[in-house]
A protein has these predicted regions:
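A short mid-domain helix/strand-loop element embedded in enzyme catalytic domains
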Residues: 1-2
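Extended accessory regions or peripheral subdomains of proteins
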Residues: 5-64
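Catalytic phosphate/nucleotide-handling subdomain of diverse soluble enzymes
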Residues: 9-13, 17, 23-35, 106-200
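A cyclin-like helical interaction fold
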Residues: 38-118, 180-227
Length: 228
């Protein structure tokens, strides 16, 4: 359920970010990605403000009676990001108003601002999200998550976004096959258990990847002989 997803997103972030303003933005991001993935690009472009507003409402319901001041501040910052995205203020000036991205709530707000303002262009959204003096790798990463969820891998791959001239995405992105395999496995869900036999090729591959830490089925990676 969406409640379980949102709670899981927050709980995972809480392992390293104990303050509510550290893990609540992760919960928001989880809900937002969940909502936009099944939607068409056109629908997201037309309804992004409503989607974000609904995401805030869902967060409030899930953490009802908890972290009230933190939720209120996060809501205000999120709404400010949305307002700035539709304003005439330059990207740089708007980002400065939202912070520098050194805290989770600022990272969320900056990434969201860039995604909404440049909802029609993955390239422009990412460029805006990393062109500031703050924690630009974090804001770029979160913005990339949002834009990737909206547009999908195939769109990015076909356009060879940010690739050197004459190079394809899979040739430019480091460890691209491992990243794609991990994404596919995450979307599939775990297919092995300590109580069940490893009796199919698919289960064997999972066992090799996540119990033995070997890149089984990923042909571009070869391990040193003493690690095989």
């Amino acid at each position: 359920s969406i409640k379980e997803l949102a709670e899981a997103g927050g709980e995972i972030a809480e392992y390293t970010h104990k303050h509510p303003l550290g893990f609540l933005p992760a919960s928001l991001l989880t809900v937002l990605l969940y909502k936009v993935v099944p939607m068409s690009v056109k629908q997201v472009q037309e309804e992004i403000d409503d989607i974000v507003a609904d995401t805030l409402n869902i967060l409030n319901r899930i953490y009802k009676g908890k972290y009230e001041s933190d939720k209120r501040y996060l809501k205000e910052l999120t709404e400010m990001a949305m307002l700035l995205a539709h304003s005439n203020i330059s990207d740089a000036d708007a980002i400065r108003q939202l912070g520098e991205g050194w805290t989770a709530e600022e990272t969320w707000a900056i990434a969201l601002f860039c995604a909404i303002r440049h909802i029609d262009s993955v390239e422009n959204a990412i460029i805006a999200s990393v062109n500031h003096d703050g924690d630009s790798d974090s804001t770029g990463s979160v913005c990339g998550n949002i834009m990737g969820a909206i547009y999908g891998y195939e769109h990015i791959k076909e356009r060879n976004i940010f690739c050197p001239e004459g190079k394809k995405l899979e040739e430019t992105l480091e460890l691209s096959e491992i990243i794609l395999a991990l994404a596919d496995d995450l979307s599939t869900g775990c297919i092995i258990s300590e109580y069940d036999p490893i009796d199919t090729p698919e289960k064997r591959q999972w066992y090799e990847r996540y119990c033995k830490m070997r890149p089984a089925g990923i042909h571009s990676i070869s391990l040193p002989k003493n690690n095989q």
